[in-house]
Amino acid sequence: MLSKRNLAMMLIMFGVVLVLFLSTAVMKEYFNDYDVNHAALEDRISREKSEFATGPRQHVVYVGAQDAGFYPPILEWAGYRKMSFYEAADVETGIAQADAYEKADAYLLLDGDALEQDTQQAAELLTAYVREGGTVIFCSLPDYQTIQGCDTLRQLLGIQKLRAESVELLEIWLYEGFLLGGEVCYAFDELQIPERIDMGREIPWYDISARTKSYMVGYVTAREKGDAGLSNEDMPAILWRSNTGNGCVFAVNGDYMEGEAALGLLDAMVYESREYALYAVVNAQNLSVAGFPTLTSENEEAFRQVYGFDSQQFCRDVIWPSLVAATESGGWKISAFLSVKQSNATAPEANMDFFTEYLKYYNEESAEAGIALGRKEDTDIRRSLTEEKAKLDSMDLTYAFTGGYIRSENEEQLSRLLKPDGSMDILPDMRTVVTEGGSEQAVFSWLTDQITRQSITVDGYQHTYMDNFRLKSLQTALGYSNVQADMYRVVWLEDRKDAWECVSEELAANIDTHWKPFAAFDKTTITESDRRVRIFLNERITSSISDTEAGRQITVQVENFNNEAWLMLRTHGEKPKSMEGGTWKRIEEDAYLLHLTSDTAAVVLQSDLENYYYEGM
């Protein structure tokens, strides 16, 4: 039987536990400064317009058409690397311009169509240029017949045999050590998910010589290979380097240089042609959730048929918890771009009390609240944004909206929101705008002198072969990605596959799996990323290597330095031994992320090999 004394002790213990529980909840609520955007507390970094202390150190000469798919990313790459850019109408003019620079500082980029006329003369000029130490990059190849008809061109490209004008591939292998992220096989057999296959599998079959190095190769079936008595070395080449004299030629067999993928390929080619590579990166991985939350019951009838309750409840009770669960293991930070109302056709009034709840959730999860700039198929985004801002102001909060998201159909209206000085009058705190991107839109850039633009780089609900290829390329070039989770698609679903239970499963699997090789890069909110983008766009990196008593030392200088900078260091068998002016971390073999805390830094390298030998130098 329970004594009075024991009963009293139990009641006291229950009381203490209850008080502790309630006090914890109260303290959590009290210290939750949810109406503060912590990412906006850092000062806004201004656009640097002053000239660099010295002229461009590196130069790009492009020979080809401006309507080629690789022309925009080449321009973008040259801008990111602070290189001078020169265009030439023909090979002879291009070589004359490239000859004005030191061979180690110039890159001659070619559209294969530029060699369709006067092929023999162009091939001879290019061969002489490469033998003297020049670096030539064929962004696309001349057509099969042109290569077949010119032995000098075949020798320059390192092609020993032309086997077929077109061959259907069973697999494409991208070997490790070129783009970051390790080796990968893109297979085309019946076991693969058809929706993921978006790489072309038919290419000309060029058999390259022993003086080349392959980075990406296609494979035919074992039967085809066996019947022809071929080995792996005879398989169709896609990306390779050919050495001639003191220089080298890079060749791309296919359309892989079109779009954002070109950025990483170009940096990888520079790395493969030099003793080491050192260049600026952003070091930011973003997850942008567009149109979340919606504070109004949208698409009510259809939504209740599919989910059983309205979109407001669904966002709060289903989507938010599953977003937190999906991002937890990878340490992702959510940037959620709210919409008071997603469509002008939506009749019900917004429940603004939900917004305060979300701000508390975000603060607990280190997430950031952004704002959607306009609505679905909006004819006047200025009017709708003014209405939404008035609703938010009625909450009497001090939260600074520094990140915005605009749908592609509304981008043409973006200028209506901008003041002459480049700021937004409706949202004066705005620092960066996320756009849905496109083949000719830069990964990021200055929208105005006050605001940056950051493009979506990948759809989080899918991961095709080309998505994977672009991801590896952008991580190689920029250490950057901006993953989109589109809630407009979920709320206004047109197909059962757009339902949250379907797309959320894909999102969780994709961001957990495909970003693992890039865990060294930081996860950021969109405003944290904006700060790093501004640092990247303003700065220029120069470096040199020399032998010292401590070992081979890379000396780094950063112009327009702003407290910190992130750099990619890629070596050939060496690794950092010590560093002054910053720290480093390993990304993968021969690839390191440097964090500079001074405008000058020095990295001493060490090698496990007694006699260091770099192939091709």
Positions of PLM-derived features:
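Aromatic-Pro/Gly-enriched surface loop or interdomain linker
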Residues: 9-103, 281, 295, 319-332, ...
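A glycine-centered loop/beta-turn motif at secondary-structure junctions
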Residues: 58, 103-104, 196-284, 480-481
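Metal-dependent polysaccharide deacetylase catalytic core of the NodB/CE4 family, i.e.
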Residues: 61-64, 130-132, 138-168, 293-297, ...
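Short alpha-beta junction capping motif
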Residues: 100-149, 246
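C-terminal beta-strand-rich structural cap/linker in extracellular carbohydrate-active enzymes
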Residues: 117-120, 588-617
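An acidic, glycine-rich "communication" segment
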Residues: 139-222
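Catalytic grooves of carbohydrate-active enzymes
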Residues: 254, 276-277, 283-294, 327, ...
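Active-site beta->alpha N-cap acidic-glycine motif
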Residues: 255-361
